[in-house]
Amino acid sequence: MKKSRPQSPLIRRLLYFWLPLAALLLGMGYLSQIRYNPAKEAKAGLDRLNHWRTQAGLQPLAPNAQLQKAAQNHANYLSRHPEGHDETQRSHPSYTGADPQTRAAAAGYSAGVAENLTISNFARSGRTSTDSLMTALYHRLALLTPTHNEAGAAWVRGKYNAFVVEQGSSQERELCAQASQLAQNRSRYLLTLLCNGERTSIPLNELPPEHLAPVKFPIGNNIDPSYDGKENPNPMPTRNPVGNPVSIAFYGNQAPITLHRFTLRSSHGEIANPTILTAASDPNHQLQTNEFALFAPKPLDYNTEYTAQFVYSQNGKQHTETWTFRTRKKRHWFE
């Protein structure tokens, strides 16, 4: 009788350890991709955004059916064609317009919108998607628009995973709905809004109230310590992973801001050699005149309290804004 050749230690390790481990990891990866419920993830993403807006002292975003429809259509489209904010494939069943304003109008939303989104090859939860957007400077500033008070979100898993948030102002929506009627009036002010994708002048006796308090972020607790460099366009295109950007923005019709000093410190001292972005130094020319950001040269420490200080002049007077935040704890030992 022919005897079989004994297996080598390498073959035994491959058969009894590495192959089962690989099968287990693949199975876990597969299950992690199918466990998501799109409606629940969309709601979780919007809830997470409202959590961050509340920590920043802003009003939460109420669900709006038209904005949700616009977000759903675009997320459906992105799950097949990952083109960002543009749509070029008119034959796609969910195509409703080339740009966010056209798509919002097609969904029945008359006012201007801000659209933010993530696209990935693998499914990410709505909460994780929102947290990622909040570390991306340009997206964050739009998500924290203080006059916005309604939104719609959608999460879709197709060839690609897409998460989309559309947000707007109920006050502007109502003014757009009355634009034709108000156009007959003789009024003191003329307010220009984006209505149904077109610039529209609306006569008003009184202008809507403006949010004049600066919006600061991060603020509060459980803050991600880093920015991964994946925002498009990238505000830090030549750097390795850096600190979660610290931003301050002044909204409304305000006098220009002159920056004197922007610092970030912890109990270990002031962060050295930060990158300060302003409208003048922003490599992508995305920042507005009264928007400012500070990037630490490397990720911030976990579970650490930081204090940001922004010293500036406005209308000939010097002011100081100071706020604190604490980074989150490590989630696992790989971090």
Annotate each predicted stretch with a short phrase:
Residues 226-229, 233-335:
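Acidic, low-complexity Ser/Thr/Gly/Pro-rich repeat segments typical of extracellular/periplasmic
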